[in-house]
Amino acid sequence: QTFQYSRGWTN
């Protein structure tokens, strides 16, 4: 998982 600014958690 990575955290993207103003988008939330994505795989």
Swiss-Prot record:
GO terms for biological process: neuropeptide signaling pathway. In larvae, both corazonin and corazonin(3-11) are expressed in the CNS but not the midgut or thoracic perisympathetic organs (tPSO) and abdominal perisympathetic organs (aPSO). Corazonin is expressed in the ring gland (at protein level). In adults, corazonin is expressed in brain, cardiaca, corpora allata and thoracic-abdominal ganglion (at protein level). The modification Pyrrolidone carboxylic acid is found at residue 1. GO terms for cellular component: extracellular region. It is found in: Secreted. Its main location: secreted. The modification Asparagine amide is found at residue 11. Keywords: Amidation, Neuropeptide, Pyrrolidone carboxylic acid, Secreted. The keyword Secreted applies. Belongs to the corazonin family. Cardioactive peptide. Corazonin is probably involved in the physiological regulation of the heart beat. This is Corazonin. It comes from Delia radicum (Cabbage root fly).
